A protein has these predicted regions:
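Residue-level hotspots within the lipid-embedded alpha helices of multi-pass solute transporters
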Residues: 34-38, 71, 111, 115, ...
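Short runs within selected transmembrane alpha-helices of multi-pass transporters and secretion channels
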Residues: 77, 147-166, 174-182, 203-218, ...
Length: 466
């Protein structure tokens, strides 16, 4: 049996929930949105870098902290999207609407809680985490932190709204709003940083305004009934439904733990990697930047799989859940192979776009090419497949596997391999960096193998949330 064969003979074409045209309309805007976010993000970094080293360092420190919050809001959004998708597949749009309202309640409550905790204790918090940085960097970080924290409620609303629209198969709207948000951010940076010359505060205000603008627009669309199955009803009347909140949190909490712990693991690896020298740090940063572009198809298809597989599970179409999961994985492998092959070929040119020393450039080129090989073979099963499992409600399994794999291989093995190399040859910091990445590839192999087995044994099909 071919795992990734989409066999129409197993069910009549007329009985299939989704056409290939539908899948294309769902996934292509998600790919475009991911690419846009990466490209605009790079432009944003260039604009912010004009503030100076202290400013860009402060922004970088706050962004690392903010990433934990972003992962948390994304996890709640995933929980809401899974529950909403399953109810839509079950032909229970009224339940999907109730899930939407409860998702918004949870997201707003948690985001305002973080605002209430982070703002008064911002000095203590940043000093506790980044106490060794210089005074100018800390001053920049504190200024940017205030504006970033104020944007959390808007970020929560945006993530939740976008996830709900995706659960209905409408990914075009979030793409359009994403374009609007990024234009706001770029224009805001230009006006406030270059024009008004208010420096780091300008970058923070632009972040706040762009997130607020995107959240307000998406929220307004979500409040309109139109022909949508999911919309917010009676928003002026607060409604707390504990059973529905439990369903959302049953997906959101494990996903949040998984995402947050993964981010902590990445930060730890970055911490011990910082001892390998400037060339290794720069090469690692460039490889991560280039690799993130090759992951765009897999990330986009992972988001789309929540809608497709979730609705199949809700409709009790388990065969179709397997079929579409297989098809989406096949598309992921083909698309990531194509993108990774292009990056592999043009690696010298891409790395050459960055101002690096000869040592860093050679190291970045070598690691980027090995990463592209691993990406095309290992990454889809390790990171796209778990979204298929989560869409069915199999979130505890993915959380446990991901956390064990991350600590055992990405952190422990990376540390042991790289430091063994340095112990044998102290001058071989370039080889030590290869050791870090090799540990990460082992992480991909381990989690990918277990997710593959889980998909094959079909136990994930019995984890329905609703």
């Amino acid at each position: 049996m071919n795992l990734f064969a989409f066999r129409k003979d197993t069910e009549k074409s007329s009985d299939l929930l989704f056409s290939r045209n539908y899948l294309a309309k769902l996934i292509l805007p998600l790919v475009a949105e991911q690419f846009l976010a990466m490209t605009i993000g790079a432009c944003d970094q260039v604009m912010v870098s004009s503030i100076g080293e202290a400013g860009i360092s402060g922004v970088s420190l706050v962004d690392q902290f903010s990433q934990l919050m972003i992962q948390l809001f994304a996890a709640f959004a995933t929980g809401g999207a899974v529950v909403s998708s399953q109810y839509l597949g079950h032909k229970s749009p009224e339940k999907a609407r109730l899930a939407a309202k409860q998702l918004m309640n949870i997201s707003l409550f948690v985001s305002f809680l973080f605002v209430a905790l982070c703002l008064p204790f911002r000095v203590w918090l940043l000093r506790a985490v980044y106490g060794k940085v210089g005074k100018d960097v800390m001053a920049s970080a504190l200024t940017y932190f205030v504006w970033t924290v104020l944007s959390f409620p808007f970020l929560a609303v945006y993530n939740s709204s976008a996830a709900l629209f995706r659960s209905m198969g409408n990914s075009k709207l979030s793409l359009k709003v994403s374009i609007f948000m990024n234009i706001l951010n770029i224009v805001g940076n230009a006006v406030l940083i270059y024009g008004a010359k208010i420096g780091i505060a300008g970058a923070g205000i632009s972040t706040l305004v762009s997130r607020a603008g995107g959240a307000i627009v998406l929220f307004a669309f979500l409040c309109k009934k139109n022909d949508s199955d999911v919309y917010l009803e009676n928003i002026q009347k607060p409604e707390i439904n504990i059973p529905m909140i439990r369903r959302i949190l049953s997906v959101g909490v494990p996903s949040g733990i998984e995402n947050s712990v993964f981010h902590i693991g990445k930060t730890l690896v970055q911490a011990f990697l910082s001892g390998f020298g400037t060339a290794a740090i720069a090469a690692n940063a460039i490889t991560n930047t280039v690799a993130s572009f090759s992951n765009i198809p897999g990330n986009a298809i992972g988001l789309g799989s929540v809608t497709v597989v979730g609705q199949c599970i809700g409709a009790d179409k388990k065969k179709q859940a397997v079929q579409y999961g297989s098809l989406l994985m096949k598309i992921t492998y083909l698309s990531m192979f194509a993108v990774s092959a292009l990056i592999f070929i043009f690696t010298p040119f891409l790395v050459g776009l960055f101002k690096l020393s000869d040592e860093a450039r050679v190291l970045a080129s070598g690691i980027t090419r090995t990463c592209m090989i691993a990406n095309s073979v290992l990454w889809p099963m390790a990171f796209t497949m778990p979204n298929v499992l989560r869409a069915a409600g199999d979130v505890k399994f993915t959380m446990i596997v991901s956390n064990i794999s991350m600590w055992a291989f990405r952190v422990l093995f990376s540390y042991l391999i790289s430091h063994y190399i340095l112990l044998c040859k102290p001058s071989a910091s370039h080889l030590a960096l290869y050791g870090v990445w090799f540990g990460m590839y082992l992480d991909w192999v381990f989690r990918g193998a277990l997710f593959f087995i889980r998909f094959k044994n079909r136990k994930w099909l019995d984890k329905k949330i609703i």
